[in-house]
Amino acid sequence: MLARQSQEPMKLHIFRALFVVVCLTGAFAERPGGFRVIGPGGGGAMFNPTISPHDTNTVLVSCDMTGSYITHDGGRTWRMFNLRGVVNFFVFDPLDPKTMYAHATGLWRSTDGGERWDLVYPSPSAVKGVKMNSDHADEQILADPDPLKAISALAVDPSNSKILYAAAGTKESPALFVSRDYGKSWQKQVGLAGVPRRLWVDPNSAADGRTLFLASEHAIAVIGPGGVRSFPLPAAVNEISLGFGSGPQPTIYATSEHGIYVSNDAGANWRKSDLPGAGANVRAIATSLHHPETAYVSYDHLTVDGESWMGVAKTTNSGADWKLVWKESDVAAKNVNDAWITERFGAGWGENPLNLTVAQQDANLAYGTDLGRTMRTADGGATWAAVYSRRVNDAGWSSLGLDVTTSYGIHFDPFDPKRQFITYTDIGLFRSEDGGLSWTSSTAGVPREWMNTTYWIVFDPKVRGRMWSVNSYTHDLPRPKMWRHNSVLHYKGGVCRSDDGGKNWTESNVGMDETGATHILLDPTSPVDARVLYVAGFGRGVYKSSDGGRSWALKNSGITQDQPFAWRLARSSSGTLYEVIARRSEDGSIGNAGDGALYRSTDGAEHWLPVSLPEGTNGLNGLAIDPESPDRLYLAAWARATGEHGDGGGIFLSENGGKSWKQVLDKDRHIYDVTIDPQDPNVLYAAGFESSAWRSADRGLHWTRIPGFNFKWAHRVIPDPLHHDEVYITTFGGSVWHGAIDGQRRDADIATPVLEPGQ
């Protein structure tokens, strides 16, 4: 198939590429610079699917990696939008089909179908700043006044869009608040016993005396003209869902570690509802707001006929009985039509749905989101289909816009510009043979216990098809969450080699301890038949091979850190090696054993000497070296958790090999990496965890933000080798972005100036 494609006329290739781009972006306004996300799609946990009450083709989904997604065509295409943090719920206006709400760091509202978002709460005029000094640069809007504090649930009045109900406050003093002016001002109505997770307005109640239902972990609170009534839940609940039918009281479904519970009288009384079989664990549950007799529940470890199953069950009689409409074991169910994830990793990889939603207009339409996918049924569960990826050809897949993958680099085969690779977390290495139009898993031969993450690859510039990869079971390094409670000496991983362009791999690890191998560097001056390679082993140090990776030796002479967090390597044009040691503290301290470090070697890693760091900096993350001036160094630094914005982070420049430093970018203090344009050393790029990517055209002295890119957690910018005005940007949870650097300077997604990124 690939060979036949390569012989097609160029016009057909161009048409096909344009067709793919138009199909994937035609429903949405173009971002500045034409930025779009590439890759196979899916790959990470998705949450909070929410279907519009006006148009069932419009659906919102969030993830745990800060991106949010919207479709207007029933999942055929999605657009990512970014609100500077993880969205924990969506609410559609029941009267205006263009208006919707999302709660992330604050409460946001879109009035144009999800294209642009305005901050509703806190009021933009009350915003005094943004605190983001933590390792993930998690954001807290600093506002004064701030009467609501944290909002945990929201509802819009069914007959008046100006009236908003919010469960808000602190954990110690939650309360119900109401706004009658579209969120401009709020009045406290009543205190609550627990923090509500969900909030519903009874559409059948009087407009001048609404009845509200608020669900917390342990109780249902009913608030109406007669005051507040509280009904205890039968157990601490994981999920809860409510619907209003023809009866006087709503039907409520809840899941807990003890099973499913159903109430037909607003929570006053509960009955247990069991799935067929035995031993089921239940997770998500959802009913249709206007068809509460129908509900779907996510389950696993259900034993039927001696076998264990997972999937989704459905009731059409308020839990009197359940039918298993998605039933899988190790073998994929015939009625579940997944994309590449089941094909590559098996039926259990994504697990049973984390969240479910059911259309309030049509109880046969439901979505389920899991650890890597969004799945859809339009026939009441008779069939389920993936809506995160589509097959492009016999071997490749392309994203539909739902991308929740962490990427470290995009890599281009020096002998074939159409062959590209993305190094991913959780799903390992992916390969494209058609210039990025489609992608396929490329980890055949990698040991199973290493397959989770491919951190980096390197090509032999003289031997077609020869390449090396560094892999690990441990993902997301160097983030502290990965080593906070786990010994780095227990990490699994190492080096693999391919001689057929990444199609097949063999372990190439002799002499190397199992390690979280995070970077690999090839000395281009070494003999072709005896390539010199260097590897950063996180928690081990630096390994060197002088025989093309067949054998390795640890080279830590001069490195003083115990279990050094070896993270990145760099080599100057003069042959000097640099090793970046990641910080192993997260409390904001400095001047102790937790500091990161920079080392230099002038004898091929046989001996290492420390390089001074900028004052107040101990969290270095990347290093770039000017190819024409080997003493000109650019340091990417990660802020310490002190102050409002974090201290010691940004970009620093040394013109004397690290003897002294000056800061050249301060406004972004969580910089992941700096890269140099291989075609012009005057041009540099940088990115990090503050919703921005940066460009300098004067050797790093001044920086401007690249318009169009606004994913919260960026990794690195990689220039497009075929189009000098375009770049790729890898991310922590948003796959790979591709677009032009000279896009129109206007906001993308966020329409509130005080919270536009990069200020």
Predicted features and spans:
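Bacterial N-terminal signal peptides that target proteins for export
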Residues: R4-A17
